[in-house]
């Protein structure tokens, strides 16, 4: 916890995650919501477009927004392509980004790391802000030391645009760090329908499910002779992500580098 007032701008404040982030900013005494970034509604107040008491102005131009409001932190909850632009712009303005969008390549991350070093400020990119999901990934990495046979099933609402999810991909990356590369399944298996065995990350199979009624869920299934281990996390609403957003906003004020993944700021 910090007593310092942290001035924040929220990009994507009218989205499902953004609305929860606005509530978080309103309910956190040391957060001050100074503006929102949106593709429309320039010059209006947040209270004009969503159910909130916030009078924060809405901007459509990120450069103007950051210059006029001088925030400490940009919370970006937009789309992968917009998020990439916003993250770079924020760093160029000396504003610390906390990013909940996915789709950053290794080249993107390298460029952002260089920017954080040049500016001497932090940046946190989190494929998943739910603390339970982060612990699931950490537990999966631990289990992979003993269970090399593993598959991942991630399940999300049918409005999600990317597959696999950032959490699913990040889980596979973490497991691959400790697991010897191995193609999962029978070496001679054949897919009767292309894609039936899911995506392949270093031999780890990832399966993506998209259905209405779901929010964000993931199972990591391990198997060996005579036993299986399942590690599962479920987010039943988007409020579940706000503890991670709050932690990230507080922590980004005290770091001077790029952090990819909430697991790197949770002991």
From Swiss-Prot:
One Pfam family per UniProt: DapB_N
Listed SUPFAM superfamilies: Glyceraldehyde-3-phosphate dehydrogenase-like, C-terminal domain, NAD(P)-binding Rossmann-fold domains
Question: Which residues does the annotation say bind NAD(+)?
Answer: 12-17, 38, 100-102, 126-129
Please list the residues that make up the active site: 156 (proton donor/acceptor), 160 (proton donor)
The entry's cellular-component GO terms read:
cytosol
Gene name for this UniProt entry:
dapB
Alphabetical GO biological process terms? diaminopimelate biosynthetic process; lysine biosynthetic process via diaminopimelate
Q: What is this protein called?
A: 4-hydroxy-tetrahydrodipicolinate reductase
Q: Which InterPro entries match?
A: DapB_C (IPR022663), DapB_N (IPR000846), DapB_N_CS (IPR022664), DHDPR_bac (IPR023940), NAD(P)-bd_dom_sf (IPR036291)
């Amino acid at each position: 916890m910090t007593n310092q007032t942290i001035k924040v701008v929220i990009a994507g404040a009218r989205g499902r995650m953004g609305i929860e982030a606005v509530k978080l900013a309103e309910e956190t005494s040391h957060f001050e919501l100074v503006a929102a970034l949106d593709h429309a509604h320039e010059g209006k107040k947040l209270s004009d477009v969503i159910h909130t008491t916030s009078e924060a102005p809405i901007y459509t131009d990120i450069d103007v927004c950051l210059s006029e409001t001088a925030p400490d932190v940009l919370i970006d909850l937009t789309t992968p392509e917009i998020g990439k632009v916003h993250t770079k712009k924020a760093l160029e303005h000396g504003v610390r980004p906390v990013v909940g969008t996915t789709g950053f390549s290794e080249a993107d991350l390298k460029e952002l790391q260089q920017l954080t070093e040049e500016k001497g400020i932090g940046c946190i990119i989190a494929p998943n802000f739910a603390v339970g999901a982060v612990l699931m990934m950490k537990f999966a990495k631990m289990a992979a030391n003993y269970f090399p046979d593993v598959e991942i099933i991630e399940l999300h609402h049918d409005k999600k645009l990317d597959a696999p999810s950032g959490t699913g991909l990040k889980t596979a990356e973490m497991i691959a760090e400790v697991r010897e590369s191995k193609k999962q399944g029978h070496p001679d298996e054949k897919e009767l329908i292309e894609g039936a065995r899911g995506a392949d990350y270093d031999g780890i199979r990832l399966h993506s499910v998209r259905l209405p009624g779901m929010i964000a869920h993931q199972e990591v299934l391990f198997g060996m002779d005579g036993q299986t281990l399942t590690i599962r996390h479920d987010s039943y609403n988007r409020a579940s992500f706000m503890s991670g957003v709050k932690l990230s906003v507080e922590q980004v004020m005290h770091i001077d580098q790029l952090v990819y993944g909430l697991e790197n700021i949770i002991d």
